A protein has these predicted regions:
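Non-transmembrane, aqueous-exposed alpha-helical and coiled segments at domain scale
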Residues: 1-251
Length: 251
């Protein structure tokens, strides 16, 4: 389907995604909120910092946006909600009774000890590099998630998310000795929302880019207007010094 200029980005996305072009007002509103919450998040996140660094070299807009996309493609930046979705499916596959809090808690402990899922010792969707008390984006988003889950008849799945949200901070403090404060981030629920909207997983990161291109563009404009020097971060070598080894003696 072709886009309709009279519709919002969220409405057009859902309209073009679906064979019947139909969507509910709540679906469009929830996706619109998701795009708003992902549109900008300061200059320190990896893709936005990439935009500013590349812009400072004097390159063109297309190249700066391409560099930002390369950053977002990395799973540590753009793939967080995918990891949450894979983890949640792993939990469903391995619990006998998904509503049993004791069994769920035991499995979350296995995750933290690197004994389950990808064995990285993480509960994905929990914690953030900047936020400790709460991720304000998640606080705003959760109310819409609850409304959509109710409309879609997914209250049981929502319950699993909210129980993990309740248990995880205490378990992380208890098992990993991390006491600075851990709370769910926006990625914890975003994949669940996209799934309820029928959006394929392959589009989760591109959808992130659809939103974040606004923030990238704003930072690029600011860099062009207010800075006149190339960004060159300082680095300090921590490798120590070593005696020179002749090439003939090197392994």
């Amino acid at each position: 389907h072709r886009p309709d200029p009279s519709l919002s980005t969220a409405e057009n996305f859902l309209r073009m995604l679906r064979p019947d072009m139909q969507y509910t007002p709540l679906e469009a509103r929830v996706l619109d909120v998701a795009l708003l919450l992902h549109a900008e998040h300061g200059g320190g996140n990896n893709s936005t910092f990439t935009t500013r660094v590349v812009t400072s070299s004097g390159t063109d807009t297309y190249s700066a946006m391409a560099a930002a996309l390369c950053s977002l493609k990395g799973p540590r930046h753009g793939g967080a909600n995918l990891m949450v979705m894979h983890m949640m499916q792993n939990i469903r596959d391995n619990l006998h009774d998904i509503e049993d809090d004791e069994e769920l808690e035991a499995y979350l402990k296995k995750l933290l000890h690197g004994e389950a899922f990808d064995r990285k010792g993480l509960i994905y969707g929990m914690g953030h590099a900047v936020y400790s008390l709460s991720d304000p984006r998640e606080v705003v988003f959760k109310g819409y998630v609850e409304q959509l889950a109710h409309e879609k008849g997914r209250d049981k799945d929502l319950s699993l998310y909210t129980r993990i949200e309740r248990m995880a901070p205490q378990l992380i403090a208890q098992e990993r000795k991390i006491f600075k404060g851990v709370s769910p981030n926006v990625d914890f629920y975003s994949g669940f929302v996209y799934e309820m909207l029928g959006i394929p997983m392959e589009l989760y990161t591109p959808l992130f880019a659809v939103a974040r291109v606004m923030g990238w563009s704003a930072h690029r404009i600011e860099e062009l207007l207010s800075a006149n020097k190339i960004i060159r971060p300082a680095y300090k070598s921590l490798g120590g010094t070593h005696d020179y080894i002749p090439r003939s003696q090197r392994a």
